[in-house]
């Protein structure tokens, strides 16, 4: 399994599934969430509304999967990251859960490639370095435990230069 880091637009990634940094209502918003909803087209919003009607809101640390609308990917996994308060409200655990559950959903569909944004590091205010450490630790731990998986590539798609530098530094570190 290959873990890669790129700078770019998550909506343009040539992968089986992209992960959306969603809000609990799954109805789009700003940042990555808004960009994905806009690029995927109106059918995504309709499908997300159906999911919410069925399950209610999606709490932080949880994830659901939908089709990808007009995107190149086949699916979108909507992972609801935590809002950073002070680090004393299980924020790191909830963030790790987003990555773990997204990987479980992708593996459950026998997909081979998944692209993650930098979940919770925008308006949700999660410290970028800690978020990168949690993300890389979690996907590596998942890969160790789920070694017999269809997933061949886990890609982190960084929107900004700061996250790109953090991920590139940490990906080569044995600490994470």
Curated annotation (Swiss-Prot):
PROSITE patterns reported in the protein's UniProt record: MACRO
Macro domain segment(s): 1-175
Transmembrane segments annotated in the record for this chain: none
Source taxon at top rank: Bacteria
Pfam families assigned to the protein according to its UniProt record, in alphabetical order: Macro (PF01661)
NCBIfam families for the chain: PRK00431.1-4 (NF001663), PRK00431.1-6 (NF001664)
Family: Belongs to the MacroD-type family.
Record's protein name: Macro domain-containing protein LMOf2365_2748
Source organism of the structure: Listeria monocytogenes serotype 4b (strain F2365)
